């Protein structure tokens, strides 16, 4: 069955590349229902915002976006949907991918299908190494977890305990922070990996207290797990006792801040994007993306990965004249530079990963009572340290 599917991809690729397309289809795979539907909603908001600003035409070609739903990580379903999009729908580009396993599962079909993949979220460093046709416009966990180590040391914190959820991104975050923190003279006194299903954090908080650490580095999936952890951090007296919390920005993404509330105030994170980022490009983007998403409080970081992903895809379509040519499309965006809503960015010509600023943010409360990530420091032109660690 696998051989038949790949043969179909190859035949379709030859037929589709023989002529110019009047309509160029982009297949977007992501979670548009289920527990992670808000992330898919952000994908769509970013795509809609880009097309509202730039139209749906590139030269003589009309761009059409075709969506497919993978409610939660499901590599087999993701691969099957990607094959269906390429063979039956005739998409020339694959994009989206909130979960790393879903992105990894699709990489083997890119060459046979003659299609590039633009990763709009999935944050494991090694995805770009699986195929020369992968380009990333999001971030990696290593990229956002490394600078916070410097922040902790600058705050006088020499001993930290690491607490992460025990799955791929959590392990990446733990390793990234530990490498940067210990290389600069800090000590990770203990590294705790919690099962994803953990909902009682009191024993973890006691271990943190007993460790003698001055600070906590934490990485957890957004939503209920983060809410429970943050509540326990406050309720068990860690915040009031001065044990500082450091994390990548997933912990305080904007769509979670209303639920986190006062518990998140003062938390320091490093991340590639905040909705509050102060620039003309971001103000314009946020205006359009909020229209697209409907509820302004739901806008969060996956939207900017999708917005910039469409910018890269439009450049690919322009470079290929609407023809199906994955190698030429990817070559055209190597070294590409532009000013994104998040700030200045570029596509590294070697890794095809996005180089970008990483911002230190502190959760603050606005005059209207809403919570936001206030940017207070910039780490410029950050690549992906995770690629060197492979």
From Swiss-Prot:
Source species: Brucella abortus (strain 2308)
CDD domains, per the entry: PBP1_RPA0985_benzoate-like
InterPro entries: BCAA_transport (IPR051010), Leu-bd (IPR028081), Leu_Ile_Val-bd (IPR000709), Peripla_BP_I (IPR028082)
SUPFAM superfamilies recorded: Periplasmic binding protein-like I (SSF53822)
Name of the protein in its database record: Leu/Ile/Val-binding protein homolog 6
Alphabetized UniProt keyword annotations: Amino-acid transport, Signal, Transport
Protein's job: Component of an amino-acid transport system.
Family: Belongs to the leucine-binding protein family.
Biological process annotations from GO: amino acid transport
Pfam families: Peripla_BP_6
Residues in the signal sequence: 1-21
